[in-house]
């Protein structure tokens, strides 16, 4: 029996990060976590590109452009969709997640998903803080692992 597992070594990897400007104070903290996760696993800062888009709804199109560019080994998506008093949350959160999953399947590009979908600002702050549990950091480390898993399988 052969077992495939990805390592957490990002040395030499090129990584693209797509960030939503909406709820920027949360997204910036998630981005800091993603960059921390990448650098602590061997990805050099000069090998990281960050693209800012207006809101979470625009994340998929920028992500697909990066996934098909041939420049990256893996990508990370970063955003924060916070439930409000309208149905906007439902129209954005699900389609963004579905689109990112579809981009992975269509392109073979592993994509770490750090687009928070939370009920309130307090939950967003809990998931984007500087300590353990920063979802940006977790997504970035997962993206490195998946890039290595897929490399081993190809």
Indicate where each model-derived feature is located.
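Generic secondary-structure signature for well-ordered alpha-helical cores
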Residues: 24, 36-44, 64-71, 101-105, ...
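Glycine-rich oxoanion-binding loops at beta->alpha junctions
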Residues: 51-69, 116, 120-121
């Amino acid at each position: 029996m052969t077992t495939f597992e990805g390592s957490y070594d990002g040395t030499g990897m090129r990584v693209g990060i797509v960030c939503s400007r909406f709820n920027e104070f949360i997204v910036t903290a998630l981005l800091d976590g993603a960059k921390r996760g990448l650098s602590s696993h061997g990805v050099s800062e000069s090998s990281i590109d960050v693209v800012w888009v207006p809101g979470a709804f625009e994340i998929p199109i920028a992500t697909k452009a990066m996934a098909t560019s041939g420049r990256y080994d893996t990508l990370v998506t970063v955003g924060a969709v916070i439930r409000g008093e309208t149905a906007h949350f439902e129209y954005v959160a699900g389609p963004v997640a579905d689109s990112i999953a579809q981009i992975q399947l269509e392109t073979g590009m592993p994509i770490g998903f750090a687009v928070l979908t939370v009920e309130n600002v307090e939950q967003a702050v809990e998931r984007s803080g500087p300590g353990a549990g920063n979802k940006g950091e977790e997504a970035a480390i997962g993206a490195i692992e998946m890039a290595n898993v897929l490399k081993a399988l190809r």
